[in-house]
From Swiss-Prot:
Keyword Secreted: yes
Pathway linked to the protein: Glycan degradation; xylan degradation
EC nos: 3.2.1.8
Single GO term (MF): endo-1,4-beta-xylanase activity
Function: Endo-1,4-beta-xylanase involved in the hydrolysis of xylan, a major structural heterogeneous polysaccharide found in plant biomass representing the second most abundant polysaccharide in the biosphere, after cellulose.
Name this protein carries in UniProt: Endo-1,4-beta-xylanase B
Length: 225
C-alpha cells in the first residue's frame, strides 16, 4: 500500500511539473493585459468640467475624457461602474446634452449626483437598457418635464459605497417613460417635484451626466454643454 501511495504521489508531481512554463507566463501576461484595459476609479477636472469615474473592478471598462464636456465609455461583462462629466458642486440647472448610448443588458443614462445632510444619491434617468432601475424602489408619483412623464421612486441602500465611504442612504429616482438620448434636462422640475413628496435634498456635491453599467456590456459617447 505504501509503495502504491508513493507511486501515486510521484505521478501527481510529475503531472504538475509537466505543465509548460510558457503557458503559465502566457496566462499571466493575458491577465496583466486585461487589467491594463480597465480604467481605474478617479475624479478631477478636465477641460473645464468636473468628472467622476467609479468601478468595482469587475469586467473590462474603459472611460475616456474628451474635449470640453465630452466623454466616452466602452464596457464588457462588467460588475458595476458609473462615470461622466458635469459640475462640482451641482445645482438646479438646465443640462443640455447629446450623444449615443448603447447598452447590452442593464445600463442607465442619467443626470446623477449626490447631496450631503442628508446623504442622498439621485438619478434623473433619460434612457436605460433592459431593466427599469426604478422597479426595485418604492413608487411615489410622477412629474412631467421636457416632453415626457417621469416616474418617481425612492430606495434605501444599506452599507453601500457612497461619497462618504460605506454608508446607509436614500436614493431618489426620476425615470423617463419616453426614453431619449439627447435634449435638455430641467433639473429644477425634478427637485421641486421631489420636495413636494417629502423627498428633500441636502447640500449639493457633484452632479454629472452619467453612464452606468451593471453586469452588462455596451458603449456610450456623451457631450454636455
Amino acid at each position: 500500500m505504501l509503495t502504491k501511495n508513493l507511486l501515486l504521489c510521484f505521478a501527481a508531481a510529475k503531472a504538475v511539473l509537466a505543465v509548460p512554463h510558457d503557458s503559465v507566463v502566457e496566462r499571466s501576461d493575458a491577465l496583466h493585459k486585461l487589467s491594463e484595459r480597465s480604467t481605474p476609479s478617479s475624479t478631477g477636472e478636465n477641460n473645464g468640467y468636473y468628472y467622476s469615474f467609479w468601478t468595482d473592478g469587475g469586467g473590462d471598462v474603459t472611460y475616456t475624457n474628451g474635449n470640453a464636456g465630452s466623454y466616452s465609455v466602452e464596457w464588457s461583462n462588467v460588475g458595476n461602474f458609473v462615470g461622466g462629466k458635469g459640475w462640482n458642486p451641482g445645482s438646479a440647472k438646465d443640462i443640455t446634452y447629446s450623444g449615443t448610448f448603447t447598452p447590452s443588458g442593464n445600463g442607465y443614462l442619467s443626470v446623477y449626483g449626490w447631496t450631503t445632510d442628508p446623504l442622498i444619491e439621485y438619478y434623473i434617468v433619460e434612457s436605460y437598457g433592459d431593466y427599469n432601475p426604478g422597479s426595485g424602489g418604492t413608487y411615489k408619483g410622477t412629474v412631467t418635464s421636457d416632453g415626457s412623464v417621469y416616474d418617481i421612486y425612492t430606495a434605501t441602500r444599506t452599507n453601500a459605497p457612497s461619497i462618504q465611504g460605506t454608508a446607509t442612504f436614500t436614493q431618489y429616482w426620476s425615470v423617463r417613460q419616453n426614453k431619449r438620448v439627447g435634449g435638455t434636462v430641467t433639473t429644477s422640475n425634478h427637485f421641486n417635484a421631489w420636495a413636494k413628496l417629502g423627498m428633500n435634498l441636502g447640500t449639493h456635491n457633484y452632479q454629472i451626466l452619467a453612464t452606468e453599467g451593471y453586469q452588462s456590456s455596451g458603449s456610450s459617447s456623451i457631450t454636455i454643454q
